C-alpha cells in the first residue's frame, strides 16, 4: 500500500490524556484510535503499542511519551499519552507536548485520586486551556446515583483550580468495552470526540500570533548596520516593520527592520520557524545582545519576578544529588541565555529534593521578556538541574 499523503485540509489540534494511574488513560487512547479506525479516520493502535512509549529528550530530560494521530469529521488530532506519572509532570512542565486541551480520565469506580488533582493543578499552572472529562469504567458501576456523585466531585475539583467545572463536558463510558467492540460503549467514544471537537477551540496558529524572535547572535555589516539573527518563534516579520528589542535592560529599545535575510537571500517576509537575520535601523552593535528578543511593539514586556511550576531533575537524570533551599541562586536559561535568579520556596516548604515538582517564586537579576507559559531550564555550572514554566508574573 502506498504511503498516505498528509492532508492539511483540516485544522490541527494537540491533545492528550491525563489522570490518575490505572484509571484507563492508555486504554482510552487505544479505544479512540480503534473506534475511529472503523470510520477510516485513524490507524487502530493496541494498548501495548501505546504503552511501549519511546523515550525522548527535551531540555536534557528523558521523557517517555506515546504519540498517536487521528481525525474526526472536523479536525486532525495529535494525541499524547504518557506511561508514568513522572513522565506527565516532566512533559507538561517542559512543554515537550504542548496541549491545546486535555481529556481527563477518571475511573467511575474509584472517583478522583491524588494524581487526578495533581494533573488538574499542572494543567492550570502550565496553561492547558481546556479539559474534557471521560468518566471511565462506567460498566462496573450499576448505581446511577454513585455516577452522579463522582461527576459532581470531578466538577468541584476542576472549579477548585479555576476551570469552569459547571460547563466542562463529562462523558460517561467504558474504554475497555469500546475497545472490545461493544456498540453501546463505542457510541460513548464518538460522543467524547464530538465533545472534544466542540468544546476545545482550534488554537491560533503560531504564524498568526504577534511577532517574536529570540536573538541568538549579533554582528555589524559595515555601511549597512547591525544584524540580529535567530529563529522566528511566532508571527511574521516584513521589511519596514517596527520592532522592540526587549530584555536585559530596563527599557525596551524601539527600532525598524530595514532588511530580512534567510540563507543569504533577501526576503519580503519571514514567518514562524524561519532562521533569519534582521537588519535593524539606527542600532549600534553594543545596543543589542544574545538573550534579548525582537518583538512586535507592546506584545511582550520584560520582567524580573514571577511564580513558576518547576520539576527538579533526579541525580540519575544528571541533576543535583542534594536538596536545595530558599535563596538558592542558580542560572535560569530563557530561550538563548542564562540569567542568575534567586529562588523563594512557598511557605511551609523547607527544601526541594531531586525528583520533586514544586511551585516557587523567582527573582532575576536582569529583566527578561517573559509571559505566562514561558518555559525555561534551571542550570548550575552549565548542567541542567530543573525545568520550569512561568505560572504568574509578579513584576
UniProtKB/Swiss-Prot annotation:
Coiled-coil stretches noted in the UniProt entry, renumbered to this chain: none
Gene3D superfamilies attached to this UniProt entry: P-loop containing nucleotide triphosphate hydrolases, Translation factors
Region listing for G4, in residue ranges: 136-139
GO function terms (MF aspect): GTP binding; GTPase activity; translation elongation factor activity
Keywords linked to the UniProt accession: Cytoplasm, Elongation factor, GTP-binding, Hydrolase, Magnesium, Metal-binding, Nucleotide-binding, Protein biosynthesis
Region ranges (G2): 60-64
Residues involved in GTP binding: 19-26, 81-85, 136-139
Residues of the signal peptide: none
Region (G1): 19-26
Cellular component terms per the entry's GO annotation: cytosol
Localization per record: Cytoplasm
EC number: 3.6.5.3
Top-rank EC class of the record's enzyme: hydrolase
Every tr-type G domain range: 10-204
Annotated spans, G3: 81-84
CDD domains tied to this protein: EF_Tu (cd01884), EFTU_II (cd03697), EFTU_III (cd03707)
SUPFAM superfamilies the record matches: EF-Tu/eEF-1alpha/eIF2-gamma C-terminal domain, P-loop containing nucleoside triphosphate hydrolases, Translation proteins
InterPro entries, A to Z: EF-Tu_GTP-bd (IPR041709), EF-Tu_GTPase (IPR050055), EFTu-like_2 (IPR004161), EFTU_2 (IPR033720), G_TR_CS (IPR031157), P-loop_NTPase (IPR027417), Small_GTP-bd (IPR005225), T_Tr_GTP-bd_dom (IPR000795)
Family: Belongs to the TRAFAC class translation factor GTPase superfamily. Classic translation factor GTPase family. EF-Tu/EF-1A subfamily.
HAMAP family per UniProt: EF_Tu_B (MF_00118_B)
Assembly information from the UniProt record: Monomer.
Biological role: GTP hydrolase that promotes the GTP-dependent binding of aminoacyl-tRNA to the A-site of ribosomes during protein biosynthesis.
UniProt name for this protein: Elongation factor Tu
